[in-house]
Structures are given as C-alpha cells and as structure tokens.
Amino acid sequence: MAALEERELSQEQTEKLLQFQDLTGIESMDQCRQTLQQHNWNIEAAVQDRLNEQEGVPRVFNNPPNRPLQVNTADHRVYSYVVSRPQPRGLLGWGYYLIMLPFRITYYTLLDIFRFTLRFIRPDPRSRVTDPVGDVVSFIHLFEEKYGRIHPVFYQGTYSQALNDAKQELRFLLVYLHGEDHQDSDDFCRNTLCTPEVTHFINSRMLFWACSTNKPEGFRVSQALRENTYPFLGMIMLKDRRMTVVGRLEGLMQPQDLINQLTFIIEANQTYLVSERLEREERNETQVLRQQQDEAYLVSLRADQEKERKKKEKQEQKRREEEEAQRKQMLEERKKRNLEEEKERKSECLPAEPVPDHPDNVKIIFKMPNGTRVERRFLFTQSLSVIHDFLFSLKETPEKFQIVTSFPRRVLPCLPSEEIPVPPTLQEAGLSQSQLLFVQDLTDD
C-alpha cells in the first residue's frame, strides 16, 4: 500500500518527501508524508515543526484562526486526529525560520548522535519496569499536586490491568501519555483535561489510564503505542476479540474539541462493543444452559448410581442372608448328624437290660416331654449316668434334658458336676424297685 501511495504522489511531492526525510532523520515514510500533508506540503514549515517538537521550545509563530485537523487514512480502522502546528507567517517568521534552520539541523543531528552513542554506554533506565503500579500512583500524586483534584478518575493500576478490566467490562479505555517536557502538556492538563465537562464526559463513558513517559511504565506504553507528539490520547477497546487502538488524538485540543472527537470515536465503534456484548451474553447463556444440562445430567447420573447402589446393596444383603441361612442350615445338619452319631454311640455303649427276675432289678417308667411313656429295667448298682445315656439314645428325647422324681420332687444328678464329680448309683439316689421319673426338656433354656 505504501508503494501505491508513493505512486500517487507527484514528482515534486516525492522530492519534498525524500528531502524532508533526509533533514529530519525520520525512518517512517508514512510519518514523513503525514507530517508534510499536515503542513500542505510546505517543507520549511514541516521541518520547523519537527525541530520545535524535538527541542520543546515555545512556538514562534502565531496560531491560525482555525486549526487544521488531519485524519490518518493509512489504516481505516484507526481514527487519527492530529492538531498540527501553525506555519510561519510574515517576513519576520520566515526570516527567523531560515536563520535558525541550519543551527537546528546541526543541533539535532549532534543530539541524535550523542543519544545514539549514549545508548550503548548507559541504557535508558526507563526500559526497566520494576514497579509499574508505583509508577502510575506516583504520577497521579504529582498530577494532583500540580493540577488539583478535579480531573477524570485515574485507573490506579498497571496498563495491563486496565486493558484486562476494559476487556472484561466491555468498556472503552482512554490512555493518556503525559510528556512532561513538551510545551503543550501543561496547557492541555490545566485547561482541557481538568475541566468539569471533560472530566464528567470521560468518567461517564470510559476507563481512564494515564502515566508520564518519564516513568518506566509510561515509557513502556509509549513504545507500544508509538505516539508522534504530545499531548497524546489513545482510545482502546475490544474489537474482533482483541484489544485494539481505534482512535489516536495528538496535539493540544480545546475541551469541546476533545469531547467531539471522543464522541465520534465512541459512536463509530459502539457497534463493535454491542456486538461483542451480545456474543458474550450468547456465550454466557450457552454456558449456563450447558451447565444446567451438565447439572441435570449429574443429578440423573447420581440418581442412577444411587439406584444401582441400592440394588447392589439389596442383592448383597440377599446374598449374605442366603449364605447365612446356608451356613446355619449346614451347622444345624452337622449338629444333627453329630447328635445322631452321639446317640448311636451312647446306645452301643449301654449295658444290657437285666432279666426281670434279677434281685437288683429296678423297673423305671419314664414320662417323656411329648407325653409318651418309656419303660426299662436297670440295676441298683448302676450309675445314674446309665439312665441318662439310655434316655439320650432315644430319638424322641430332646438334646438337653433333666430327670426329675415325682415325690418328693428333685432333680437326679445324672451327669458329673463340681459338687458331685461322680454321679451316684440308683440305690444311692434312693430309687425304689418300681419308679416313675419325668424327663424335662431343657433345649430352650
């Protein structure tokens, strides 16, 4: 595009462009062309303006009745408003300009050489940013000491933090770079920036961040925004999902001029913020909907998991109950087999029933718990344990039982105990030749 623009220039304009670049040492051809256009291709006025700007001396020419305003057309996405310096007027002005021109060129050439050499010896201390917040707060304090407390609300944070907040809040961010050595900075701050109408306008429409270019943080931002002169204001906003400079205001402006230009930039770019806000709301709604769907899915998943857990728990409980029932059944069957084996063993070990006419015969009738009667003969000399073993060997006898006499009622000690280690004989127990004994079930005791 630069080559196309150069082809659009006349031969005379091209020669002036190259001559101006040689005199000022500006590397950017676009900047040289812009400066010449601001001065209506008056090379003497353009060179004088550039030298005055670098030197920081007061203006030597009177202000014109109307300040020419320039719009940067190199990039149609960025609106540029530049207040150009006045051209020399009259013989006195041109005479002073022509006399001072060689001295200024020599002075600034030597100054540039000195600065270039000094850069290798001692790097610019502003290039090291160690406390960006401190730089901003320090500038605010110095600003209020010099210009008072009536001013737009300064963002008390770093440039990066201001960018992030403007992005998050979808607001315009106005950046002011304060050139302390520039002759227009004091006038701008005192008579434009700190006026009530400008203060109210900025506070109600945008975030406002400012810093001096003499501070490391301000110098770093200056390197990024690449301002041409002071005062400098840059309007930044979220555009196409990136923080973009959409407006550049340079030079001394009156309050109403500043408000008009800021209003123009806002109105020209408001649709981008509205579009971004709608997209963000749509993304938020989509995110909320997705979150609600995820929550509903999680609720359903938890319900299914709880249902599955209860099902498994019920199955596990049923399995344990079945295993416990099987275990008890096996124990019961084993116990039953052991009892049957014990009954059979006791039956095999019983002494033979004595004959009816034996002199020591004892006839005993047992009344069982189920009401049946069992009769058998024993000998007086036999132990009561024989009676117990006989009853134990019977199928209808319960597992645990005791033998009780009818009158007087007493329990016969048929099994060994601590008190009676050896059970007595039938005779010692006081049984008669014909005896009725009761068998009591002790299984449930």
Swiss-Prot record:
<dbReference type="Pfam" id="PF22566">
    <property type="entry name" value="UBA_8"/>
</dbReference>
<dbReference type="GO" id="GO:0043130">
    <property type="term" value="F:ubiquitin binding"/>
</dbReference>
<dbReference type="Pfam" id="PF00789">
    <property type="entry name" value="UBX"/>
</dbReference>
<keyword id="KW-0551">Lipid droplet</keyword>
<feature type="coiled-coil region">
    <location>
        <begin position="275"/>
        <end position="353"/>
    </location>
</feature>
<keyword id="KW-0963">Cytoplasm</keyword>
<protein>
    <recommendedName>
        <fullName>FAS-associated factor 2-A</fullName>
    </recommendedName>
</protein>
<dbReference type="InterPro" id="IPR036249">
    <property type="entry name" value="Thioredoxin-like_sf"/>
</dbReference>
<dbReference type="InterPro" id="IPR029071">
    <property type="entry name" value="Ubiquitin-like_domsf"/>
</dbReference>
<dbReference type="Pfam" id="PF21021">
    <property type="entry name" value="FAF1"/>
</dbReference>
<feature type="domain" description="UBA">
    <location>
        <begin position="12"/>
        <end position="53"/>
    </location>
</feature>
<feature type="domain" description="UBX">
    <location>
        <begin position="357"/>
        <end position="439"/>
    </location>
</feature>
<dbReference type="InterPro" id="IPR009060">
    <property type="entry name" value="UBA-like_sf"/>
</dbReference>
<dbReference type="InterPro" id="IPR054109">
    <property type="entry name" value="UBA_8"/>
</dbReference>
<feature type="region of interest" description="Disordered">
    <location>
        <begin position="302"/>
        <end position="354"/>
    </location>
</feature>
<dbReference type="GO" id="GO:0036503">
    <property type="term" value="P:ERAD pathway"/>
</dbReference>
<dbReference type="GO" id="GO:0030674">
    <property type="term" value="F:protein-macromolecule adaptor activity"/>
</dbReference>
<dbReference type="GO" id="GO:0005811">
    <property type="term" value="C:lipid droplet"/>
</dbReference>
<dbReference type="GO" id="GO:0035617">
    <property type="term" value="P:stress granule disassembly"/>
</dbReference>
<dbReference type="InterPro" id="IPR049483">
    <property type="entry name" value="FAF1_2-like_UAS"/>
</dbReference>
<dbReference type="InterPro" id="IPR006577">
    <property type="entry name" value="UAS"/>
</dbReference>
<dbReference type="InterPro" id="IPR050730">
    <property type="entry name" value="UBX_domain-protein"/>
</dbReference>
<dbReference type="GO" id="GO:0005783">
    <property type="term" value="C:endoplasmic reticulum"/>
</dbReference>
<keyword id="KW-0175">Coiled coil</keyword>
<keyword id="KW-0256">Endoplasmic reticulum</keyword>
<dbReference type="InterPro" id="IPR001012">
    <property type="entry name" value="UBX_dom"/>
</dbReference>
<comment type="function">
    <text>Plays an important role in endoplasmic reticulum-associated degradation (ERAD) that mediates ubiquitin-dependent degradation of misfolded endoplasmic reticulum proteins. Involved in inhibition of lipid droplet degradation. Involved in stress granule disassembly.</text>
</comment>
<feature type="compositionally biased region" description="Basic and acidic residues">
    <location>
        <begin position="303"/>
        <end position="348"/>
    </location>
</feature>
